[in-house]
Amino acid sequence: MVKVGIVGGTGYTGVELLRLLAQHPQAEVVVITSRSEAGMPVAEMYPNLRGHYDGLAFSVPDVKTLGACDVVFFATPHGVAHALAGELLAAGTKVIDLSADFRLQDPVEWAKWYGQPHGAPQLLQDAVYGLPEVNREQIKNARLIAVPGCYPTATQLGFLPLLEAGIADNTRLIADCKSGVSGAGRGLSIGSLYSEANESFKAYAVKGHRHLPEITQGLRRAAGGDIGLTFVPHLVPMIRGIHSTLYATVADRSVDLQALFEKRYADEPFVDVMPAGSHPETRSVRGANVCRIAVHRPQGGDLVVVLSVIDNLVKGASGQAVQNMNILFGLDERAGLSHAGMMP
């Protein structure tokens, strides 16, 4: 049984980790921390978890207690894992970080986008980017895993087959992405209030979003060189979900795009390439650790459209984190993640 600790258990990704791990056959949450809620039983804050964590309460983060775990998940704002990850790694504990702290390999670039110096640049050489569909072998031997963001997960999985095959014009990629309001986190903000977000639909961060350098970093690796990406995120009035509509120019019209995508993801348990002509819906992946993809070539032209949907809290965060844990500890990759999407 893998002994699990969670730092930051009161946000959406924290409670989603608890929900998924409650049904995991080979993992047990033994520590969960929150400075603001220390002493409160988990089941009191989250009644949906009654009967699963009745003996577990939030505690103040303590390196000694966390260091006794096999793995510690950080479901925290950026900067927190910088301060604690090194001590946990020194104690022999594996670290899986859901924040952005170790996603970017360039600490200067990280500081530019997050507005503060990188707090642990010496650990970047140990950090493995936790996109299993790309880095599965590296994940198996990792000490520190950086779980990809939600937009980067949906966008990279949609573009990868085209870039790896070398058939797209890498200089003019477009990612037109929509997210539900849970992507903004559980903290109070005016933009995510019901009266502000409901019955409205808006773009934001067009000048530059923090996920842009992460997406670009991954796509460069796939393409084997520089890429040009325009990334425009939008907020839509739903709770969960990412819908990425991706555009790339593929001049060679003889390429069987459906076959290309099906072959690339044939052995991936959590990527579903839909039949030709399909339009995946976010509700089909709600609560599931699945990226559902469809590829189109409208009017037979040279512009290819890829539709990619995920649940931002599952495959875009906590589910992918558990998937990484399963790989890291040699477990069945599907363990605890077999939930079908919730419909309606």
Curated annotation (Swiss-Prot):
GO cellular component: cytoplasm
Keyword Lipid metabolism: no
GO molecular function, a single term: NADP+ binding
InterPro entries xref list: AGPR_AS (IPR023013), AGPR_type-1 (IPR000706), NAD(P)-bd_dom_sf (IPR036291), NAGSA_dehydrogenase (IPR050085), Semialdehyde_DH_NAD-bd (IPR000534)
Catalysis: reaction(s): N-acetyl-L-glutamate 5-semialdehyde + phosphate + NADP(+) = N-acetyl-L-glutamyl 5-phosphate + NADPH + H(+)
Pathway(s) served: Amino-acid biosynthesis; L-arginine biosynthesis; N(2)-acetyl-L-ornithine from L-glutamate: step 3/4
Domain of life assignment: Bacteria
Keyword terms, alphabetized: Amino-acid biosynthesis, Arginine biosynthesis, Cytoplasm, NADP, Oxidoreductase
Biological processes annotated in GO: L-arginine biosynthetic process
Predominant place of localization: cytoplasm
EC class: oxidoreductase
General function of this protein: Catalyzes the NADPH-dependent reduction of N-acetyl-5-glutamyl phosphate to yield N-acetyl-L-glutamate 5-semialdehyde.
Protein name: N-acetyl-gamma-glutamyl-phosphate reductase
Gene: argC
